[in-house]
Amino acid sequence: MTSIKQEDLIQSIADALQYISYYHPVDYIKSLNAAYEREESPAAKEAMAQILINSRMCAEGHRPICQDTGIVTVFLEIGMNVRWDDATMGVEDMANEGVRRAYNYPDNKLRASVLADPAGKRINTRDNTPGVVNVKVVPGDTVEVIVAAKGGGSEAKSKFAMLNPSDSIVDWVLKTVPTMGAGWCPPGMLGIGIGGTAEKAMLLAKESLMEPIDINELKARGASNRAEELRLELFDKVNALGIGAQGLGGLTTVLDIKVKDFPTHAANLPVAMIPNCAATRHAHFTLDGSGPVMLDPPSLEDWPQITYDASKGTRVDLDTITPEDVASWTPGQTLLLNGKLLTGRDAAHKRMVEMLDKGEPLPVDLKGRFIYYVGPVDPVRDEVVGPAGPTTATRMDKFTRQVLEQTGLLGMVGKAERGPAAIEAIRDNKSAYLMAVGGSAYLVSKAIKAAKVVGFADLGMEAIYEFTVQDMPVTVAVDSTGESVHQTGPREWQARIGKIPVVVA
């Protein structure tokens, strides 16, 4: 019989969540660096470089890899011979107390993104609780723990289908992945759960993402069952789609494919697919009664030495920019933004549109301005703002035409692609949409020299800020004529991949 203290589980979960906020798993870094070295698409290679640079900066500075520090998932396997001598709460409450401590840790405060009353008032819980806690009771005398933090952009692209038993899983995946766009921040992993019931398939998919990246080892030894055959087939075929890093077109879309299966009803073939983004975050540890767990930090030698060359971009002064300047930009062009940049994401856009509909003045004049879709992490120490990477732009698509036409907004900055309606509005208003790299939040924050709230302060991280930026790197993703690199890039690279040998290191 092993005696484990309540405090040991709570503090171990809190420490692990802090750890994964700034340390990528080393297998991800090595796999991404290998993909970076063999990438032939300049835009995708540049995106991967920013992710790798950002990751090293976070490891050194102990600040979040991504501004979306995620909703927490905890997997607990509790041995039947474990005794909780001093417990005053259940294990789910212990896990949530660990989440609360981690996200409110003053030296590396993490962003609270969890909202209560999701179908109603959507009120921020302020401490990122509750997490999603999965508990199994198993033979043994230890507690096995996996903690993970999953951002909303990748979680939003989760898919499920109840296929017929005769349907092709491969065909469904290859049809579905292009519909996910780039909001899930590739390159990452796809977790696929097959069998059981609807909820079991989703759980299998999420569990599979906790496994290490080992596709090259699998290629070397060969498949030993149908699940491994699917992994190998899907890995090659998904990458052959040419979606590439950040959806810009390139050789690598996924670094691995994971498949877990479970027996199912004869009439069913449930299939779930969940992507893991470039900010993949998970840690595994065991409690054996000897006290809280201390996770060993990785060596900085595990990160490649890559530097960002700001001279490659065209400097833009946001304080003097004109429609003629915007019209001169070309798709895929790298810009370095300088000057005053407004922010606003889902809640701010919803409120702005409601005010416009009522004829009420907005808290800030948007005419001739650019707005950045971001919800930053709170600053610590001497920071003016915490990590401040872009959020998924398509969620603002339904607001785009009205905001452009009724406010005189000149352009937008966000993550991933825009949908057809937004692209049409951009073209009609001779606007532009610029893309910042998802997974480079700390790197972006270093370009922000001042920050102040100028509207909707009650929205917390979704308030409207005014940033003063210096050489903030972005890419022209949709130009004033409506040409989108997220359409042209993958199309070009899908064709090129079909004609060139793709070698996996």
Label the model's feature ranges.
Residues L209, I213-G242, Q246-G249, T343-T475:
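Feature captures the catalytic cores and cofactor-binding loops of soluble hydro-lyases/lyases
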Residues M1-I192, T197-D309, E405:
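Non-transmembrane, aqueous-exposed alpha-helical and coiled segments at domain scale
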Residues L163, A205-L209, A272-N276, G289-G291, ...:
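Short, solvent-exposed amphipathic alpha-helical segments in soluble enzyme
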Residues G249-I257, T264-H265, A278, K446-A505:
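C-terminal binding/interaction regions
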Residues V326-W329, L335:
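Short, well-ordered loop/turn sites that connect or cap secondary structure elements
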Residues L335-L337, L341:
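Generic structural signal for buried aliphatic residues
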Residues E324-A327, V364:
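Residue "hotspots" at secondary-structure boundaries inside conserved domains
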Residues S311-I321:
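Short, structured beta-strand/loop micro-motifs enriched in basic residues and often containing a Trp
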